[in-house]
Amino acid sequence: MPKERRSRRRPEPIIRWVSLTLTLLALCQPIQTWRCSLSLGNQQWMTAYNQEAKFSISIDQILEAHNQSPFCAKSPRYTLDSVNGYPKIYWPPPQGRRRFGARAMVTYDCEPRCPYVGADRFDCPHWDNASQADQGSFYVNHQILFLHLKQCHGIFTLTWEIWGYDPLITFSLHKIPDPPQPDFPQLNSDWVPSVRSWALLLNQTARAFPDCAICWEPSPPWAPEILVYNKTISSSGPGLALPDAQIFWVNTSSFNTTQGWHHPSQRLLFNVSQGNALLLPPISLVNLSTASSAPPTRVRRSPVAALTLGLALSVGLTGIKVAVSALSHQRLTSLIHVLEQDQQRLITAINQTHYNLLNVASVVAQNRRGLDWLYIRLGFQSLCPTINEPCCFLRIQNDSIIRLGDLQPLSQRVSTDWQWPWNWDLGLTAWVRETIHSVLSLFLLALLLLFLAPCLIKCLTSRLSKLLRQAPHFPEISFPPKPDSDYQALLPSAPEIYSHLSPTKPDYINLRPCP
């Protein structure tokens, strides 16, 4: 019977990215093996659409041997080929795939052993897109990885990236061969956003490591760019070791930056030659048993040092106050000078206006006289009786302008009274006069403090000595052995204590609060 051919017509899928990221701290052990298992469960999604999944490890390596930069001590080289004297970055190739047929389940051992300084990327393994010509192929839906860490001291990140139509995922991480070690529960969900799944795995990490504190750096997700073969440039920077190390970053057109750092987009995804990657804020685990703080220490200070500090602070505050006062005085003086200039301009304008008004009044009076002469020449009376005006005058009033003469002496007297006792100038400019005033004020204040400082120091030291002498004194109590007794009491009774007290002292001790 011929095999039924599946229809290649696809509905519009909802493509969603699912990324599981877990950040752990690689301990300084000879070897640690972790078993990572990832399962994909949506059969309809697996059979009807292309499936792509990728696993990667990023190691932020901290070198222990400074003189071995940029390699760890006795680190293996993954290939004999080299670029500029350095070996190529290790990219595990795709495993167990056929171009037009079924794929077998792949198990690959990844073994990072202190590679380059900086952030490196390992894909173990990597699936390419399935061929569009064969829609009946069996796609890998279960991946098991064994991670062997050898003398790697730093932070590494495990990342799975899956795309498709609502995939069902199951994730588990176990340490081998010690079962009691951290065992992360499985994560089952229809679709988990990347940020939420990362937070869930972070909580599982906290439960798995009860003796460690989780440090989450809440900075923006800036991440070092990935090192790619034949696309590296050398740049000098702080590095991860002392002294400064050479760090190699990617320089590709996709990143379009020369600073060596990549700011991801809003979805925290960026493209590389091997596929997409997800950037998340880094976390680290800190052992609480080794984290200890030094005990606080108390150091007694001498009274002289405290007194000197107090005097210095008082002198500084007084100097600041004098400087502020001098600055305020200078500002007020400048304001008065500006007001005087405005006053002079106003007086000049009023005088000019008064002169113009006098000219107009003279013209009007001249016209009046001409009209009166004309009316009388024609046989009429003067202008006012002819037009029935009750009041006719030819005198120009000039009494109001006399008040302006009193304004200038008054302003000069107010300015002189305000500047007392600094109303001397010796022919100097304003800023020189203010500088001399400020220097003299500070000099007089320093002389006053020099005269009063010995008295203040003597008073304070005598007061402290008096307080120390008034401290309560307790008499010394001694108990001679009794020759007629084989038993010596460890704690004497109350009558024995009072019998050995000094007769000049009362039989009680007055307890009072400290002064």
UniProtKB/Swiss-Prot annotation:
Coiled coil residues, start to end: 330-376, 388-420
Lipidation, S-palmitoyl cysteine type: 455
Site (Cleavage): 301-302
Cellular component terms per the entry's GO annotation: host cell plasma membrane; membrane; viral envelope; virion membrane
Source superkingdom: Viruses
Quaternary structure, from the entry: The mature envelope protein (Env) consists of a trimer of SU-TM heterodimers attached by a labile interchain disulfide bond.
Protein name (record): Envelope glycoprotein
Top-level taxonomy: Viruses, Riboviria, Pararnavirae, Artverviricota, Revtraviricetes
Gene: env
